[in-house]
Every structure is written in structure tokens, then in C-alpha cells.
Amino acid sequence: MLYSQRSRPRHREVTGPQPHSVAVVAKFPSSRPRDFAILERRRHEEAREQILTFTKLNTTERVKNKWARVTDQKLLHNMVQREVYRTMEEYKMHLNERRERLSTLLEREEMAYIKEMEAMEETTLERQAKMRERVKSLREKREKERMDFIAEKRDQQFREQCEELRSLRSQIHLNEVCTERMAQIVLKEELNRQRKEEDTIFDQLWEQDRLAKEEQEEKKRQKRIELNQEIACLQKAASEAQKMQEKRLKEEESKLMAEEQRLIKLEEERNLKEKQQNKLQVKSMLEDSIRLKMKRLAREQQEELALDMKILEHVMQGYQDDTEEKRQRKMELRKEQQLYREYLAQQLEEEKRQEREMDKMIEAELEKSWAKKSEQMRKEKEARKRLMKDVMDTRRVQIQEKLERNAKLQEELAHDKELLESATEEHKQLETDRNARQMKVAQQYQRDLVSQVAYQQSQRQAEREEEQREFEAGLTAEKAYQNKLREILSRPYVGHENIHPLRRGRISSPKDWLPQ
């Protein structure tokens, strides 16, 4: 029992020297500061504010990006609409101007036609005069044609009959052909040189453009990588902070649950201790009652034994004195003893009765005292139970509030996590769309370059084919010309209709080409 008393849990209540006096031991000062809960709450609120600020900033940036994208699209759409509207207005204006010009021209033509119709109303004399004028002009024209024909025939006859003129014309024509051929070769070389220079310039420009675009793409890629790394670091930091917050909330929740279990266990131990104390008190009272009863029975037995010893001594003493007087005395003594025994029996009975009454009174007093003490203990127990219940209820309410607050914080953290994940997914989707657009633009640019190169190659091939055709046509023309020249030189006459107009002028004036 001493070990159980020594190892039982200690409480803050200590009984005093007087009945119903209880003292409360002071609590040990907490190692935490007084405003620990306030500081902890502030720290939680600051962390939550930081997460909310980050989420709000991310949402704001996403809204800004979306607004900028929509604004750019609207600006582009409005610009295209304005350009289309301006083009349509210009087209309508040009169309109206053209209609006005055509209507004005139509009016002028109608007026001219009317005037012409009015002017055509002529008399017979005017018609005869016009007919005479027409006959005269026709006669002059026919005479001019006849004179031209005669001059041509004379010139033709001169060319056919002059051998020196024929050889000189052949030499001049040959010189012109050589000069034109040399000019064609020089022009071809110049065109080839210009084309090569243009190809070189185009290659340099294309290479510079390619390098500039590669450098720009590299800068964009580095910028995207840095931005993605920064976003990944921010997401990782937010995720780590959220994990730490969740871990701290879970630890706090487990601590609160453990504290609640500890309070329940303390309440159960207190109830068990009260039951044990009640049992010990009842046992102590029963032991005290049994001890008093045993003392009383032992005292009665000792008194009876003393009385029997005294009577036995008188009897033994009577056997030693055998005189009559003594016998008589013995008889008297026996009577006295009998009376005394009866008196003692009466007194003993009276004492027993008084003791029974006293026991009853004591038991009644004990019962009354026990009832009073039980009532007092019950009241104290009820007061302690109420106090403990209030403390437990308050602590339970505090724990429940903390659990609800932790659950709310966990819900907010989960919501923030969902927002962060949605923002991350949206950023990834935007990055994917942007990469796809850039890839599409790059592919389109590559296709344009390939088509441009193919077009340039086809153009060059067409130019080479055209040059080849021109060269072949030149050779054919030269060959035909030589054949024609030989044919003309072999014939006595060459007509003017097969000579170039520029050469015809030179041939028509012999003073320009005849030697002086």
C-alpha cells in the first residue's frame, strides 16, 4: 500500500490541517513566453498571407498576360479592320472617281457625236467639193507611191549593178553581226556577274538573317529557361512551404489529439483515484469500528475473568476454614456473592444496554457524521467534477477550435495547392502552345526558305534554259542569216522588205556608208 501511495500520480490539491481545507500547489512557470500563442498565430498568419500574396500575384500576372494577349488580338483585329475599311473606302473613292470620269467622258463623247451629227448635215455643193478634194488627194497619193516605187526600183537597180556596193554591204553587215555578237557576249558576262553578285548578296543576307534569328531564338530560349527555372524554384519553395505547413499542422493535430487523450486518461485516473479513496475511507471506518468492538469485548472478557478469579479465591479460602461460623459466613458470602453476581449481571446487562445504546448513538453519530462528510465529500466531488468538467470542456473546446482551425488551414492550403497546380498547368499549357506556335512559325519559315530556294533555283534554271534557248536561237538565226546572206549575195537583187528598218535608213543614204 505504501508503494501504491508513493507511486500514485500527484495532484495540485493538498489537504490542510483542518477538515475541508484544501490548498492548490502553484504551477511551475512555463518555459515558453507569455505571448507564445500570439506569436505563433502571427507567424501562421504571416505564412498564410505570403502564400495568399503569391497566389494573388500569380493570378494577377495570369490575368495581366491574358488581358495583354486579348488586347493584342483586339488591336490586331481592329488594325486589320481599319486597314480593310480604309482600303474599301479608297477602292470606293477610286470607283466613284472613275465613274465620274467615265460619265464625264461619255457626256463629252455624246456632245461630240451630236456636234458631228449636226456638222454632217451638209449641202450638195459641199459634198461635191469634198469629193473633188478626195479625188485630188487620191491622185497625189497615187503619184507619190509611183515616184517612190520608181526611186526604189532605181535604187534597187543601182545596188544590183554595183559590185563594190554589194561587197561593202556584206562587210558592213558582217561587222555589225560581230559587234552585236560581242555586245551579246559582254552583256551575258555582265548579267552572269550581276547574278553571281546578287546570289552572293542574297546568301550573305540569308546567312545574316539566319544567324540573327538563331541568336534571337537562343536568347528567347535562354529567357524561357530562366523563367521556367525561376517559376520552378518558386513552385518548389511554395510546395516545400506548403509541405512544412501541412507537416506542422499534422504534428499540432497529433499533439492536440494526444493532449485530448491525456486529459481523458487523467479524468479516468481521477475517477479511479476517487473510487479508491472512497474504498479506503470505508475500509478505515470499518476497521475502526471492528477495533473498538474488539477492545470492548476484550475488556468484558477481562472483567469476567477477574470476577471469576476473585470468586475462586474466596471459594478456596472457604475450604481452608471449616468452622461453622465460617460456613455460615460462607453461606452469607455465597448469598452476597449470588446477589453481587446478580447485581453485577444486572450492572453488566445495564452496561451492555448502555453500550448498545452508546453504540447505537455512536453509530448514529457516525452515520450522521459520515452522511455529513459524505455530503460534504459529494459536494466537493461535484465541485471538483464541475471544475474539472469546465476545465475539460474548455480544453476540449480549445482543442476542437484548434482542430477546426487546422482543418480550415489544411483546406486553405489544399485550395492554394490546387490554385498553384492549376497555375502551373496553365503556364505549362501556355508554354506548350507558345512552343507549338514558334515551331509552326519556324516550320513555315523553313518551308518559305525551301520554297524560296526552290523558286530561285527554278528561276536560275529557267534563266539558264532561256539563255541556252537564246544562244541556240542566236546560233540558228546566225546560221539562217549566213545562209540568207549567201543566198542574197548569190542572187542579183535584194528587196527592202527583208532589211531591218534601221539598216534600211543607212542603205537608203549611200553617202553615209560609201567611202569618201
Swiss-Prot record:
InterPro entries: CFAP53/TCHP, TPH_dom. Residues 417-436, 461-472 have a biased composition (Basic and acidic residues). It is found in: Cytoplasm, Cytoskeleton, Cilium axoneme; Cytoplasm, Cytoskeleton, Microtubule organizing center, Centrosome, Centriolar satellite. The keyword Cytoplasm applies. Its main location: cytoplasm. The keyword Cytoplasm applies. Pfam families: TPH. Residues 417-443, 455-475 are annotated as: Disordered. One of its GO terms (biological process) is determination of left/right symmetry. Keywords: Cell projection, Cilium, Cilium biogenesis/degradation, Coiled coil, Cytoplasm, Cytoskeleton. GO terms for cellular component: centriolar satellite; cilium; cytoplasm. Belongs to the CFAP53 family. Microtubule inner protein (MIP) part of the dynein-decorated doublet microtubules (DMTs) in cilia axoneme, which is required for motile cilia beating. Regulates motility patterns of both 9+0 and 9+2 motile cilia through differential localization and recruitment of axonemal dynein components. Required for motile cilium formation and movement. Involved in the establishment of left-right symmetry during embryogenesis. This is Cilia- and flagella-associated protein 53. The lineage of its organism: Eukaryota, Metazoa, Chordata, Craniata, Vertebrata. The gene is cfap53.L.
